[in-house]
Amino acid sequence: MHASDQTIFALSSGRPPSAIAIVRVSGSRGAKIVEALAGRLPTPRMAMRALIKDRDGEPIDDAVVLWFPGPASATGEDVAEFHIHGGRAVLAALMATLSSFENVRAAEPGEFTRRAFEHGKIDLTEAEGLDDLIHADTDRQRRQALRQLNGLLGDRARDWRAQIIEAQALIEAGIDFADEGDVPDDLLAPALAKIEALAGEIEALLAAQGRSERLRDGLVVAIVGPPNVGKSTLMNQLARREVAIVSPHAGTTRDVIEVHLDLDGYPVTVIDTAGIRDSDDPVEQEGVRRAQARAAEADLVLWLLADDQVAAPAAIESDAPVWLVRNKVDLAGAATGVKPAKNLEANLGQNVPQPSFAISAKRGDGIADLVGALGGFAAEFFGAGEAGAITRQRHRDLLRDALVMLQCSKRGRAEELVAEDLRSASRSLGRLLGQVDVEDVLDALFRDFCIGK
């Protein structure tokens, strides 16, 4: 029996113990299962209280049962839900009973959503939106994912594809029946006008999106600098907890440490790196190499110095902006009575990174200003990302492919070639929606879902 012909079940709520556990069932044997466990089928989409029993008639739990006959259900199949008390023993008894039915099995990760996709309840962009919603860490990520789940891109792509197919039909009618006198002499002009308008809409969407797809992964900020300048202390201040070991001994941090922050709803990953210096220690050398590599990939570099140090960030090979952060200002200023920032400017001249910040990572002085600046940088970096319809590189690539073919079709080509261009553009939008050649994308996407979703 094919996997899609089997009835599946899974825990769709949090892991036990919990107040309530929800077990979802989807497939053709759903009605038989509900009747066997609860005695009868509930009225569709109405909650029914029932003492559910196992195959031997032994009570499992006093539960609430819901019944959603297909195709008017989340998956398009018959769906049942058992709302039980969330104890481990109760859940285990229900799961064991469900497993005892023929052609009924535990669901794979993302299998409920995949069945919803296969039955046309959602398209691929909406499934991706659901995946993003499940994994959203910040409010802006949540809002972006919810828009995608509700068809922000999918609805537009479906409309564009329908219009392309209509234009293609006009052109092919002109080709096929040109000698029969059954169609107007010139069907190409209105079709090309439609194509030009569509190309303009797709081009405008691509131009306006900015970094909307980056909102899923977040902004990367690397803390870089010489050893023992307080990088780990600054990391702990930003995280508001101890995530990195702080020691007075240089070279304590040997590997890259990451912490994920929520700055006004923007996801930011801060990286604490090994101190950059020449060393004979092979382990420390590897730490320095990794620090330089991660700094090169960062969207923003914080070059951290102790307040009395003079050192340019020459070791960083990155096109990202570099901000100077002078740490330990409480110690340096009090001990020397001088202004180290002036010394830095005198020695480095125009090479001083801007903007610059003076902080005490140990005491917390200046941290609020730095965090505020990071939040402003994130807002500018992402722009209106949360409202963007393009949330994955796959979306951008396929929209570009469709746009290229639409633009080709406008260049005075023969009608047969124009029809083929439109066929290619339609295929790209079909792949975007999950209607054409996307099996590898589906496998990768639904593996990322949790079991029960």
UniProtKB/Swiss-Prot annotation:
InterPro entries: G_TrmE (IPR031168), GTP-bd (IPR006073), GTP-bd_TrmE_N (IPR018948), GTPase_MnmE (IPR004520), MnmE_dom2 (IPR027368), MnmE_helical (IPR025867), P-loop_NTPase (IPR027417), Small_GTP-bd (IPR005225)
Alphabetic keyword roster: Cytoplasm, GTP-binding, Hydrolase, Magnesium, Metal-binding, Nucleotide-binding, Potassium, tRNA processing
Cell compartments where the protein resides: Cytoplasm
Requisite cofactors: K(+)
Cofactor: binding details: Binds 1 potassium ion per subunit.
Amino-acid positions noted as binding Mg(2+) in the UniProt annotation, renumbered to this chain: 232, 253
Nucleotidyltransferase in keyword set: no
GO biological process, one term: tRNA wobble uridine modification
Pfam family, one: TrmE_N
TM stretches of this protein: none
EC number: 3.6.-.-
HAMAP family, per database record: GTPase_MnmE
Known role: Exhibits a very high intrinsic GTPase hydrolysis rate. Involved in the addition of a carboxymethylaminomethyl (cmnm) group at the wobble position (U34) of certain tRNAs, forming tRNA-cmnm(5)s(2)U34.
This protein's name: tRNA modification GTPase MnmE
Gene (name only): mnmE
